[in-house]
């Protein structure tokens, strides 16, 4: 890099660090870490040598396809063939359709509900593993939580298809006490079950690791001051683990938002989620550009939500 450009970057970083500082006069910890580590090491040839494979991989298999997908959203399909162009017709058509926005709202609602429910279901178990079990037992529990990933997600989804069917295990159990049968497949409930099945092991692992790293002296001090169990959870544990809990919920939302299998096989695709809408659009006259519009909408939505969640989590953590 040109020496003048390097000098400008360092000067801007110093000015920004002086502007964003704590009340005591020290630099903001995030910016201080950025200045001391990133700016000092990244520009050296030694550091670039190790980071080059990651940069090349991301450029070839993420940034490149992403840019092509964005460009493809402006292409046109004529006689079932995609032609290069720069037209806003696909965007105007898709953004003006009510079914697109209905699918968008439904996908947001289902992914958000799945993230919230998964976090609530996982938290008591994670709390028990972090504070009530030994370290050896916790390791075995985490290993057992990894085992579901050894099997195909599609196979696990079909197993829930059998469980939730009208003649399945759940309705058979309810029938023994005079209840049912209930329709659970091809409903939003089936979609939620699939989302929770997909995200629960990962969220539980992340929450357990986060809670296990909380300083036990803080919890003990709160108990010595007379705080009850619920007071300890809300006043000490949740604020201390806020960043990890937000990241776990964020992963659940991202996985559910982009999932195709659960809403298609368990939810019946009525109404369709955005991934199902993408598949249906490509099957309808080879409209890949219109499907690219929906994909870009999903990418922008996930970027905004992920960026907002990360900023809020780390900003609050740094401000304590």
Kindly label every feature range from the protein language model:
Residues 46-79, 94, 98-212, 236, ...:
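Membrane-water interface segments at the C-terminal ends of transmembrane alpha-helices
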Residues 222:
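The alpha-helix within a helix-turn-helix
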Residues 87-95:
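A short amphipathic helical element positioned immediately N-terminal to and/or at the very start
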């Amino acid at each position: 890099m040109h020496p003048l450009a390097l000098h400008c970057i360092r000067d801007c970083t110093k000015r920004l660090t002086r502007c964003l500082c704590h009340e005591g006069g020290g630099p903001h910890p995030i910016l201080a870490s950025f200045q001391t580590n990133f700016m000092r090491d990244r520009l050296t040839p030694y550091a670039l040598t190790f980071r080059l494979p990651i940069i090349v991989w991301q450029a070839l298999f993420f940034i490149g396809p992403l840019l092509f997908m964005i460009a493809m959203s402006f292409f046109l399909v004529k006689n079932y063939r995609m032609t290069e162009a720069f037209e806003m017709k696909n965007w105007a058509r898709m953004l003006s359709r009510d079914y697109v926005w209905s699918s968008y709202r439904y996908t947001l609602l289902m992914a958000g509900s799945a993230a919230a429910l998964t976090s609530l279901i996982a938290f008591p178990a994670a709390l028990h593993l972090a504070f009530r079990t030994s370290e050896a037992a916790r390791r075995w529990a985490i290993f057992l939580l990894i085992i579901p990933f050894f099997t195909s997600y599609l196979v696990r989804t079909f197993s829930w298809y059998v469980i939730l069917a009208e003649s399945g295990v759940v309705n058979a159990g309810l029938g023994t006490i005079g209840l049912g049968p209930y329709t659970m497949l091809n409903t939003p409930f089936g979609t939620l079950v699939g989302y929770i099945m997909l995200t629960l092991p990962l969220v539980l692992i992340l929450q357990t690791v986060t809670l296990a790293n909380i300083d036990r002296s803080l919890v003990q001090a709160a108990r010595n001051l007379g705080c009850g169990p619920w007071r300890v959870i809300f006043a000490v544990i949740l604020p201390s683990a806020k960043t990890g809990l937000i990241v776990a919920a964020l992963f659940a939302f991202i996985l559910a938002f982009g999932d195709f299998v659960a809403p298609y096989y368990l939810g019946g695709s009525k109404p369709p989620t955005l991934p199902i809408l993408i598949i249906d659009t490509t099957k309808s006259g080879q409209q890949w550009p219109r499907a690219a519009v929906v994909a870009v909408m999903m990418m922008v939505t996930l970027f905004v939500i992920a960026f907002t969640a990360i900023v809020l989590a780390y900003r609050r953590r740094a401000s304590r």
